[in-house]
Amino acid sequence: MSAAVMRSRAASPPTLILYHAECADGFGAAWAIWRRYPNAEYRPVKHGEGPPANLAGHHIGLVHFSYARPTLEAIAKDAASLVVLDHHITAEQTLADLPYAYFDQKKSGAVLGWEWAHDEPAPWLLRYIQDKDLWDWALPNSREISAALASYPFDFQLWTNFEQQELEREGRAILRYENELVTKLASHATLVQFEGAT
């Protein structure tokens, strides 16, 4: 089932999006949905923490993240609706049979979020996030764009204004600086013996 089919099954637009915190792919998924549904509430969530309070009655989207099955089932029971968009194999192995869960390991959370919310192909920014998140590194200047993106805060308006060539330029400088630091640190390395081996 495609993300677009999942969207067509949604009873109403989302009122609350929960996305993986401190992660470009998680925020990219939230940004993708925000581009279509700017009036929803967007909350970052972290692994190892329980879901936020006051989820009852919301039309919830959970992107690039999922909770344990009992937690998801409890959320689904109280929510007006729930959709889970994820690409992690561990979550898919335990949640794939849930009618509100959609998984695709060949796509990033950001691209899944875009495909769920939009009919047109994902924009360049999300394709680059996917290239890094899936460790493909197939797009030109992908490492540069990834380095530049990591230097910015997670802000919807800011991300909307990114330009590809500018991120490439910034990323080249960041990678050059990182490589120089590594070279300097490596020049001070000394061999030591550890448990009889060098």
Question: What is each residue range found by the language model?
Answer:
Residues 152-198:
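A charged, amphipathic alpha-helical module
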